[in-house]
Amino acid sequence: MGNVQERPSETIDRERKRLVETLQADSGLLLDALVARGVLTGPEYEALDALPDAERRVRRLLLLVQSKGEAACQELLRCAQQTVRMPDPAWDWQHVGPGYRNRSYDPSCPGHWTPEAPSSGTTCPELPRASEQEEVGGPEGSEALQPRTPEEPELEAEATEGDEPDLEQEMNPEQEPEPEPEPEPEPEPEPEPEPEPEPEPEPEPEPEPDFQEEDESEDS
């Protein structure tokens, strides 16, 4: 007798513990994949997604899928393998191979946004192309294309008014500037008068001798 191939439901029974432990972290992504493949219906998805416990959510999911038949179990195992291993390196650009960036876009589902091909050559109409910038003359040309603000003419007018006296001096270099008037000297303060010395007291006159008394003495 040859080896009999194991059915998907038997694989789930054998690896139930490992599946529950492995799929707890990514149970939400697994539910999304099963809904997209038509394994789960909308009400079933909402009922499982509302469970707060991740372990309980995965256990209920395995039982529900096993009740749907071998085809549903096979889709579950395929989605679980893709969810856990993540073979597409789109989320890790450090390990992207050389051909991944140049791969062609896969046909999208109807109703979804389709990215434009890299070779379309469409550019934003508001941004100038590199060739247009070279024709203008690089950054200098871009400055020349910028509109001037109304404040610039006023600044230029003030600058021309301030330069007129300098131009007149350059045109008449022989004209000497007028000498500035010398400041008048301040008057010197008058010296204060010296105080007059006090007059010395006059000596009292000596009394004159009484000549009459002398005459009387001589007569006697």
Swiss-Prot record:
One of its GO terms (biological process) is release of sequestered calcium ion into cytosol by sarcoplasmic reticulum. It comes from the Eukaryota. Gene3D superfamilies: Death Domain, Fas (1.10.533.10). The modification Phosphothreonine is found at residue 149. PANTHER family: CARD6/NUCLEOLAR PROTEIN 3, NUCLEOLAR PROTEIN 3. Oligomerizes (via CARD doamin). Interacts (via CARD domain) with CASP2; inhibits CASP2 activity in a phosphorylation-dependent manner. Interacts with CASP8; decreases CASP8 activity in a mitochondria localization- and phosphorylation-dependent manner and this interaction is dissociated by calcium. Interacts with TFPT; translocates NOL3 into the nucleus and negatively regulated TFPT-induced cell death. This is Nucleolar protein 3. It comes from Mus musculus. The gene is Nol3.
